[in-house]
Regions:
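C-terminal motif of bacterial Sec signal peptides marking the signal peptidase cleavage site
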Residues: 15-18
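Immediate post-signal peptide segment of exported/extracytoplasmic ligand-binding proteins
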Residues: 20-34, 153-163, 300-319
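Bilobed "Venus flytrap"/periplasmic-binding protein-like clamshell domains
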Residues: 31-62, 67, 130-201, 284-288
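An extracytoplasmic/periplasmic, membrane-proximal ligand-sensing/linker region
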Residues: 41, 173, 177, 182-187, ...
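Beta->alpha turn/N-cap motifs
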Residues: 69-70, 80-93, 109-110, 140, ...
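Ligand-binding pocket segment of bilobal, Venus flytrap-like solute-binding proteins
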Residues: 83-86, 164-232, 319
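Ligand-binding "clamshell"
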Residues: 96-107, 111-126, 208, 220-234
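A bilobed periplasmic-binding-protein/Venus flytrap-type ligand-binding module shared by bacterial periplasmic
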Residues: 134-145, 239-253
């Protein structure tokens, strides 16, 4: 395997979050503090949650910017440096902070994270926004047509000739990383490159790579006219995205429950691709992307929330 640029070691991430986060005290008793991330999708979702709360209430909302990983976000919540996350992913949390076996069934994955997040961390995992941001192998449209590609298993015919670029963090991932890929699909690539996730799309579009592994909702998929290959042997678990909040903050401000439930099913995979493109390719600030999305949907003012979910979460938080 050729490695173009390595990932930051986990130890460094733990050291970073062990320090005080800038602009935030060690206690969040009086504020709603929302975690953002280093890539556009999590930034947009953090803005959507922030602006929804500000639109529907008079509560004060602060964001922590540029949290680099789910691990850092989890530890920050443990330290009570934040209490709401705009976007968490079922597959990431199952194999990450929950240290459980990957689950390819979306409903089972959602139930596992919902139940275990409440039991282990005293946090509420809300219903999905409506999109699944999973890992996906992708190729250029002309390459797919030339080699008649539509499924990942068909890459076996190109395993010795295709140049394949993947996200650095995926290579060593337990459960659904490269070792799991080789075991599931029964082959490996001769020309295999590890690189930062932000580089894979341009590397594919420019012809430096023939196949890459990226995220299924990235805005550059449409920009570069890329084709997603079907994970026909079901290697990758479900990565449905939801907001997450601590029981403590929901108990203090129970109105947050209905606000976050309004977002259930509000963003399709295609819509998330479009929003990501606006931020990453059109260079529109995530704050503006979120604002325009919410204005188009009238801040979901007329949405009737799922009464079953409302009753469930109120019961878990122990509020009326």
């Amino acid at each position: 395997m050729k490695k173009l640029k390595g990932a930051v070691p986990l130890l460094l991430a733990l050291v970073l979050v062990s320090c005080s986060l800038p602009g935030v005290s060690s206690s969040v008793e009086n504020d709603i503090i929302v975690a953002s991330g280093t890539y556009t999708e999590r930034q947009i979702l953090a803005e959507i949650v922030t602006q929804m709360v500000e639109h529907d209430t008079d509560l004060s909302v602060t964001q922590i910017k540029n949290l680099g990983s789910t691990t850092m976000t989890h530890i920050a919540m443990e330290k009570k440096s934040l209490n709401v996350v705009g976007g968490m992913y079922t597959g990431t949390s199952l194999t990450g902070e929950l240290a459980m076996t990957p689950e390819t069934d979306p409903e089972k994955a959602m139930e596992l994270v919902r139940t275990n997040y409440l039991k282990k961390f005293n946090r509420i995992w809300f219903p999905s926004y409506g999109f699944d941001n999973t890992y996906a192998f992708m190729v250029r449209k002309d390459f797919a047509e030339q080699h008649h590609l539509s499924k990942v298993s068909q890459l076996e015919a190109l395993k010795d000739t295709a140049k394949v670029g993947v996200d650095s963090s995926w290579v060593e991932r337990p459960g659904d990383g490269y070792e799991a890929f080789k075991a599931k699909y029964g082959f490996e690539f001769s020309n295999f490159y590890s690189m930062d996730i932000g580089l894979v799309y341009s590397a594919l579009a420019s012809g430096n790579m023939d196949v890459v592994l990226g995220y299924s909702t990235d805005g550059r998929i449409n920009s570069y006219d890329l084709v997603l290959l079907e994970d026909d042997l079901k290697l990758f678990p479900a990565y449905d995205c939801s907001p997450v909040a601590t029981v403590e903050i929901l108990k203090k401000y129970p109105e947050l429950i209905e606000i976050l439930l309004k977002l259930e099913g509000s963003i399709s995979s295609e819509k998330m691709q479009e929003l990501n493109k606006q931020a990453s390719e059109d260079r529109i600030e995530p704050q503006i992307v979120a604002k325009e999305f919410l204005e188009e949907n009238h801040y979901f003012d007329d949405v009737q929330v799922n009464e079953k979910e409302l009753e469930r979460i109120r019961g878990e938080v122990n509020v009326q």
